């Protein structure tokens, strides 16, 4: 019988003498050998051409001296590498938009916290304090048992004290008046007045001061009427051309030479307007605050001067029959003048700077006109009343131009907000809004004689064309280039037959384009400065008047 785990003594002896044999395992290290140079890591490259770092180097290593031992007698800031007094400055090219965004984001940290108005709350504590002050100024609601007399019941209809009756605008003006002592020092008579009377007198003057001048006129002829009792308003019949025809029936050409110069203004001329239909008179407004009317035929002399504005003339507009015209100036007034007698018939004071003015072209509304102001509004007036009839206020910037469409039923306006809006006349809501991120401000707009297109002078040195009816879309096939406006508001217009487009140049050139091909046909060196105003004669084939804002001369071309 076999016993489990049975073994003899001889077998144990053999097992003790045999060696313990184990298999050999060969392991391999696949990582490459890396030399850990601790000293090399502590050394910072100080090469003059080195612009890159392979690791994040501490600041104390970056600013330590390149060579030599450390100086124990200087501070850490003095021992650093600097190319200026305060530190190390490097040249960096940053766009203006990015710089302004970063700079003005920390304006409050540079200039401190702005001063808030008394009526403006900044924190929740200020809101509570403000509401408490309002409650303290609240009048006594009274006794419910008393209906009339002293102590009568007012309830929730009780008013506030005298402090609350002042508007926030008056508070802000009061603070501004207290900080300004220039006028009181110059005026010796104001020192005799009481402080309260002086403040009332200064607060009574509006922030936008309107300058009103006395209207005068000067006739530069011996007499107004001739032997047949005709004034210069009479359309001449002895000039070799019928001036009573409808403009545009003639074939127009580009002028080639300078034939005459009108001189009389002492400063630059801002606008030119030919007499409607006949064009036998030329109206000019200048930076010398004067308006002059010139004779286009015969001796081409100065006929009359209109004086009544305290600031330079901004825009002019003839009425439909030409017997009167509107003028707007930087003195924030709009005046209606009699073309023949030179009298000021009416003055429309809007207390705002008016950039443009335009008479209504609808024959049924000859007494109405529109004015575009710098405070984003278009005002509608009637010459028989100085009050505002209607206001259009959807623009976000100052109004630059007003152009009537579809025989006065609609009109289009352009603004500093780089947008164009189409309106129904009499309705203060735009029917079409044109704006794009690539659009620039378009300060001048002109309607083509056929009434189907408008040309817009853009500040990106191009003239764009839009349809003047139905959907009012841009005609992208027609873009007129080849001139530079340099930010100036330069006149743009059409020849009477619509064949050519003209505009001024910032270099003093008068530019002409072909309407069909959009090709620049001619550049006439007209003036030494920007040609701000140009006017094509409504009856002649190739006569154009030009003026500049740098000289007081009007040049006539043929």
Curated annotation (Swiss-Prot):
According to the UniProt entry, which residue ranges have a biased composition of type Low complexity? 162-171
Q: Which GO terms describe its molecular function?
A: mRNA binding
Q: Does the keyword Repeat apply?
A: yes
Q: What does UniProt give as GO cellular component? A: catalytic step 2 spliceosome; nucleus; post-mRNA release spliceosomal complex; Prp19 complex; spliceosomal complex
**Where does the signal peptide begin and end?**
none
Q: Which InterPro entries match?
A: G-protein_beta_WD-40_rep, PRPF17, WD40/YVTN_repeat-like_dom_sf, WD40_repeat_CS, WD40_repeat_dom_sf, WD40_rpt
Q: Does the keyword Cell division apply?
A: no
**PANTHER family membership:** PRE-MRNA-PROCESSING FACTOR 17
Self-association state and partner proteins as the record states: Belongs to the 40S cdc5-associated complex (or cwf complex), a spliceosome sub-complex reminiscent of a late-stage spliceosome composed of the U2, U5 and U6 snRNAs and at least brr2, cdc5, cwf2/prp3, cwf3/syf1, cwf4/syf3, cwf5/ecm2, spp42/cwf6, cwf7/spf27, cwf8, cwf9, cwf10, cwf11, cwf12, prp45/cwf13, cwf14, cwf15, cwf16, cwf17, cwf18, cwf19, cwf20, cwf21, cwf22, cwf23, cwf24, cwf25, cwf26, cyp7/cwf27, cwf28, cwf29/ist3, lea1, msl1, prp5/cwf1, prp10, prp12/sap130, prp17, prp22, sap61, sap62, sap114, sap145, slu7, smb1, smd1, smd3, smf1, smg1 and syf2.
Q: What is this protein's function?
A: Functions in the second step of pre-mRNA splicing. Involved in splicing intron which are longer than 200 nucleotides.
* Name of the protein: Pre-mRNA-processing factor 17
Q: Which organism is it from?
A: Schizosaccharomyces pombe (strain 972 / ATCC 24843)
Q: Which gene encodes it?
A: prp17
């Amino acid at each position: 019988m076999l016993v489990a785990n049975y073994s003899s003594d001889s077998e144990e002896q053999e097992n003790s003498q045999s060696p313990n044999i184990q298999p050999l395992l060969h392991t391999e290290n696949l990582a490459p050998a890396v030399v850990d140079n601790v000293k090399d890591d502590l050394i910072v490259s100080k090469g003059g051409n080195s612009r890159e770092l392979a690791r994040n180097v501490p600041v104390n290593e970056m600013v330590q001296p390149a060579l030599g031992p450390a100086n124990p007698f200087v501070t850490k800031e003095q021992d650093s590498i600097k190319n200026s007094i305060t530190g190390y400055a490097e040249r960096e090219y940053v766009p203006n938009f990015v710089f302004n965004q970063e700079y003005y984001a920390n304006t409050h940290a540079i200039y401190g916290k702005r001063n808030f108005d008394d009526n403006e709350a900044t924190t929740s504590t200020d809101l509570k304090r403000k509401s408490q002050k309002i409650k303290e100024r609240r009048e006594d609601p009274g006794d419910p048992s008393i209906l009339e007399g002293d102590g009568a019941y007012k309830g929730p209809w009780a008013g506030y004290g005298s402090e609350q009756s002042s508007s926030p605008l008056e508070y802000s003006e009061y603070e501004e008046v207290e900080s300004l002592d220039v006028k009181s020092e110059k005026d010796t008579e104001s020192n005799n007045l009481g402080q309260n009377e002086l403040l009332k007198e200064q607060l009574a003057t509006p922030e936008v001061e309107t300058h009103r001048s006395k209207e005068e006129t000067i006739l530069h002829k011996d007499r107004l009427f001739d032997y047949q009792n005709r004034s210069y308003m009479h359309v001449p019949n002895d000039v070799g051309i019928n001036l009573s025809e409808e403009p545009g029936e003639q074939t127009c050409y580009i002028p080639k030479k300078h034939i005459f110069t009108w001189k009389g203004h002492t400063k630059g001329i801002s606008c030119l307007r030919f007499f409607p239909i006949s064009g036998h008179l030329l109206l000019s407004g200048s930076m010398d605050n004067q308006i002059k009317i010139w004779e286009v035929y015969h001796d081409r002399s100065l006929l009359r001067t209109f004086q009544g504005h305290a600031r330079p003339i901004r825009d002019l507009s003839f009425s439909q029959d030409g017997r009167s015209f509107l003028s707007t100036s930087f003195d924030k007034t709009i005046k209606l003048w009699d073309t023949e007698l030179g009298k000021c018939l009416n003055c429309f004071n809007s207390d705002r700077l008016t950039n443009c003015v335009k008479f209504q072209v609808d024959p049924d509304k000859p007494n109405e006109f529109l004015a575009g102001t710098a405070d984003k509004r278009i005002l509608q007036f009637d010459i028989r009343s100085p009050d505002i009839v209607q206001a259009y206020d959807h623009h976000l910037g100052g109004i630059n131009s007003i152009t009537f469409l579809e025989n006065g039923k609609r009109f289009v306006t352009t603004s500093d907000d780089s947008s164009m809006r189409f309106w129904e006349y009499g309705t203060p809501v735009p029917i079409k809004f044109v704006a794009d991120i690539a659009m620039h401000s378009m300060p001048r707009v002109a309607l083509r004689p056929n009434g189907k297109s408008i040309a817009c002078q853009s500040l990106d040195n191009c003239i764009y064309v839009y349809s003047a009816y139905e959907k009012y879309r841009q005609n992208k096939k027609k873009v007129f280039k080849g001139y530079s406006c340099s930010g100036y508001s330069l006149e743009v217009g059409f020849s009477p037959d619509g064949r050519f487009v003209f505009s001024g140049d910032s270099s003093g050139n008068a530019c002409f384009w072909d309407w069909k091909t959009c090709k620049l046909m001619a550049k006439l060196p007209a003036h030494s400065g920007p040609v701000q105003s140009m006017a094509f004669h409504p009856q002649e084939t190739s006569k154009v008047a030009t003026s500049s804002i740098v000289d007081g001369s009007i040049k006539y071309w043929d």
